[in-house]
Amino acid sequence: MADRIYDYKREKTKRVVKKVGFVISILVILAIVFSIAFDLFLELIQIKEIGRNFVSVFWKNFYVKLSVQVVSFMILFFVFFVNNAVIKRNIERIVGKISLLKKNILNVIVSVLLALIASRYLENNLYIKFLTFKHSKPFNIKDPIFNKDVGYYVFERPFFLSIVNFLFYLVIFVCIYTVVLYIVLYGFAFVSRVNSWGVLYDKKVRSHIFFNLILIFVIKIFTLKYEMEGLLYSFFGEVVGVGYTDYYIRMNYFRLSYIVLVAVILLSIYFFIKGKYANIAKVMLSYIGWAVLGTIIATAFQYFVVSPNEQVYERSFLEKNIKFTRLAYNLENIEEKYFPVDTSGTITAEDLQKNTGTIENIRITDYPTTLAILNQIQRFKQYYIFNDADIAKYTINGKIKSVFISAREINYDGIPTKTYINQKFQYTHGYGVVMSLMTEVTPEGQPKFIIKDIPLKSLDGAPKVTQPRIYYGEKTDPYVIVNTKVDEIDYPEGDSNRLFRYDGKGGIRLTPLNRLIFSYVYKDFRLLVSTAINSNSKILINRSIIERAKKVAPFFDYDTDPYILIDGKGHLVWVLDGYTKTNYYPYSEPTEEGFNYIRNSVKVLIDAYNGTLKFYIVDKNDPIVNVYKSIYPDLFENGDIPRDIAEHIRYPEYIFKVQASVLKRYHMTNPNVFYNKEDLWDFGKHKTPDGSIDYIPPYYSVMKLPDSQKEEMILMVPFTPLKYNTMIAWLAAKSSQENYGKLVLYKFPKGSTVYSPLQVENMIDQDPQISKDLSLWNQGGSKVIRGNLLALPINQKILYIEPIYIASDNASALPEVKRVIAACNGKVVMGSSLNDALSQLVGQQVTPVKDQMQTPSQKENITQVLPSSDLLKIKSLFEDAKKALQQGNWEEFGKKFKELDDMMKNVK
């Protein structure tokens, strides 16, 4: 009787456990399905907020993802269900019925869960590859080994390779899963009274396991094709891509591997039928031995046959490597020119006169100091911040000028009282931009602002800003709620604030359902219960412009340095560069980031007030972007970028650095020179503001290139030979509308000695007077900050310019341009201004930059030259008198002032 009561309780407990397990499993499945559905709905309403024209992108992705997931789920469910059923049958044959496995519902639940997880992974990784495969386009370039169009490797091969690899690793997982499940169930049945591993000795269990192992080798046959094609990306020896050993040894190894694998599979099936599982294991291990043997043979062949005469063997393969790498990074279209540099003397006044536009645009303000000054004197309130200062070109009073333009964004760390109302309802946006000339400073040595202050003031011909509010920005990220019962703070005005209410296109209406959704998404219960929110309120989300673009088109890579412009209507518009990349371009050397092909094919314009996005194709020859256009026809705008924006865009620094980095080696097109690394280049170096030595970053400048008729904005970088400091070449990228993206490489003649930026920096340090002055200014509570050294081609000479900042030695000090250093062909001078430095360099007074637009008669009068010795003497006396006055040496001051007065009396 006692036993029966015990049995009843145990059976009841089992039923309860099974029911609870069943309910939990169903809840888990429902939770997964609900989570997927909720994520899709949330993504849809976010896409609608960004732009209804992008909804077609969402639905295209949704249908493809759904198709991939449904098909893969059905296949995976079948695989797991059948595998589990075989395991159940074998276990119950060995140990008898197991109550846990009595019904098939557990098998269904486990199979559904595993299939959901695996199909979800496959959907996320396969959908875009399927779309690009389906809409693939040719590059019209064939690889030299398999004679297939590059489009096959970029669009088709990745799709098939992903499927084959997924199946391969799936079967491996099933094998491991099967073994583990046998051991666990066997141990569960006997509750540790026997060795759980003993189940693996059962004939039918081993039959099941070895059947799965044979499947691995069957799928392996299909991977061989893609592994052989993968040699186009190999690094065996000195060649990127197929080399001599790859072509004659490893490719033949893969061809023979087909025969070996077929033999392994047939023998395994034969022994499987005979039940000789030990023989199957030996056959399978023999294939591993074959793989090891192939590696040994290839390595030995490379070492003993190829390496002793590698240059000869690899020559034709190096030619392929060079050709395809240059194609992949668009180096083939670089126009190479020789720059007949004149190193015989310094620059002349005539040289300057012939390059007036270039001289007028010589940059004497730098990014770090300009940004520091902006955050000191144009921030006004701690809840504003300048995150960046970007370079652009604008026509100011009829002349092209390079300017710094910086957005005054909202800074949530600086909000005075971090209440919910302040952070979400009142402090919602930044205000305006500041624009300063890169070529001029105030008498105090600070940037000359031509757009400044709050409210905005546009001076000296600068463009007017009619909508200064920045709701979407570079670092503007947290969500805010607008059109509530609380007015927004627009900008400070006296002792109070000007208020504002948003009337732009951005935002999602906060209906009761949307309030519930976003309170859950942001884990913010206050959003649900706040009485300040009404039926007109909208929530502004995805306000980071980069994340906003990624939300619509995640398949592009985006520049991390967007820049802001002022369009023809006075609205603020962000420009974000988008890149198409792949790591599947054959025979191309990859970058450190892993890709081996890049194009700047897309520019995204984002309205800073409305948050609207417009995608423009700027490289219509790029097959990758044309594939995306075929997939998503509604994503891109028809036509070109509007002229009022296009005239200000610039070639991106990111892709320029990538191309220049590759060019350091791949400018060598002769395979013998390339192999011997006879002419490796490096970027020029300079001294940073903290005194350390680093590579010169590419820099923008408005200048007239050699053989050009007018000034245009270019991005340039100098090259030096590797491990040597003389300058050997420089690369320029054009940003004008008619020449946008054209690259020109200027090479100096062999045998000419052109001082590099670092050598000029050393000359500055070694100049007795300059070194003395810099050391003196670096004392007594002040510090000297050396700006970026710029190398500028003027006629047939290289002119170097470096601004010198002086700042008080405290955190709140404003760096001010107090001196400008100029150098050319070994002569180094320092002046109180750019004109002064250039005057000393040429040995006579030069025309002030600001007077270049005067009439010819005025120009002639201005350029009448005083004797340079008198000018230098007057300047020297003035500096000595000023120094004596600062030191309180009245006797010396009187003496120098009298000498100066006497000289001035003789000046007509």
From Swiss-Prot:
What this protein is called in its record is UPF0182 protein Csac_0864
Query: Does Protein biosynthesis appear among the keywords?
Result: no
Membrane topology summary: Multi-pass membrane protein
Subcellular location per UniProt equals: Cell membrane
The record's GO CC annotations read:
extracellular region; plasma membrane
Just give the chief location class: membrane
Species assigned in the record:
Caldicellulosiruptor saccharolyticus (strain ATCC 43494 / DSM 8903 / Tp8T 6331)
Q: Where does the record locate the signal sequence feature? A: none
The parts of the chain that form a coiled coil are none
Q: Which of UniProt's keywords are assigned here?
A: Cell membrane, Membrane, Transmembrane, Transmembrane helix
Query: Which residue spans traverse the membrane?
Result: 22-42, 62-82, 98-118, 166-186, 208-228, 253-273, 286-306
Q: Name one Pfam family in it.
A: UPF0182
Can you list the disulfide-bonded cysteine pairs?
Answer: none
